[in-house]
């Protein structure tokens, strides 16, 4: 059973999936940094210095804090600023994956469109062609 599992785990598809998951996690971290450290500050600067990560609605009267960390300590909050940031992360990742898949499909279509070369004739076919040509000359 252990041998069977090892064979399964070492198949190309499983290894490819593992590599894809690792690269996807790294890409997710890059996109999170892009959104949190580059895009959201620019949007905040355009909108007058607003920090979207601190946008929240207190769901109880005990929540009086002005920042999200303290508000969460005081009670339940609806942190819609964090949700906006995560949604933007998702949209960027989905768009990049869409572009990558679109490019891969375009490459596949161009490869499929190329006509396949005719296979080289076998020895029998060459011999029969020579016999035919000799018979034509007689």
Swiss-Prot record:
Q: Does the record carry Repeat as a key word?
A: no
What's a Gene Ontology MF term here? Answer: mechanosensitive monoatomic ion channel activity
> What's a single GO CC term here?
plasma membrane
| Residues that span the membrane, as ranges | 19-39, 40-60, 81-101
Localization in the cell: Cell inner membrane
Question: Which Pfam families does the record cross-reference, listed alphabetically?
Answer: MscL
| Superkingdom of origin organism | Bacteria
Its membrane topology: Multi-pass membrane protein
Keywords of this entry: Cell inner membrane, Cell membrane, Ion channel, Ion transport, Membrane, Transmembrane, Transmembrane helix, Transport
Q: What function does this protein fulfil?
A: Channel that opens in response to stretch forces in the membrane lipid bilayer. May participate in the regulation of osmotic pressure changes within the cell.
Family annotation (PANTHER family): LARGE-CONDUCTANCE MECHANOSENSITIVE CHANNEL, MECHANOSENSITIVE CHANNEL MSCL
Name the family. Belongs to the MscL family.
The entry describes its oligomerization and partners as: Homopentamer.
Q: What is this protein called?
A: Large-conductance mechanosensitive channel
